[in-house]
Amino acid sequence: MSWGNAVIGIRNALAPPVITGCDDTGRVSADFHLGAAYEGPPGHVHGGVSALILDHALGEAASPDGKPRFTGSITVRYLRATRLGPLHAEAAITRTDGVKTFCAGHISDDEGVTVEAEGVFITPRRLRD
């Protein structure tokens, strides 16, 4: 676990309680619970928190070899309000093109997907072969 990461860093008292895992296919997922500290509209998750979690999940998926890839762009689509409570996030690579890795993911609750995201992640120059 990272010490200083804004999403999962244990030194960040406001980091959402998200711990990601990766399956054999490279899909990153997390089951977590967001409470009042992450509230935007009454009873619902702040949209910026959803974007933060998805940026992190997509970035984890984009870096299966342990080499970090940095967000080049991210597009977030809010399908409906995300209620506070138990949630699930998933992300996976959709394709690669040179130094660019394309990923897609979502957050869902017990009624289905609430937020979707797509991102392009770039391998930094210092890590290119």
For each feature predicted by the language model, list its residue ranges.
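HotDog/MaoC-like acyl-thioester-processing domains
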Residues: T82-L84, T94-D129
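Non-catalytic linker/capping segments at the edges of enzyme domains
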Residues: M1-D31
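Conserved short histidine dyad/triad with adjacent acidic residue
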Residues: H33-E39
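Intrinsic-disorder/low-complexity, polar/charged segments enriched in Ser/Thr/Lys/Arg/Asp/Glu/Gln
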Residues: T25-S29, S73, P86-H88, F102, ...
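A short, polar/proline- and glycine-enriched secondary-structure boundary/capping micro-motif
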Residues: G40-G43, R126-R128
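Residue-level recognition of well-ordered beta-strand positions that form the cores
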Residues: D31-H33, T75-R77, E90-A92, H106, ...
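Hydrophobic beta-strand-centered segment that forms part of the acyl-chain substrate-binding groove
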Residues: A57-H88, I93-T94
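Active-site helix/loop of acyl-thioester processing domains in fatty-acid/polyketide metabolism
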Residues: D24-R27, A37, H44-P68
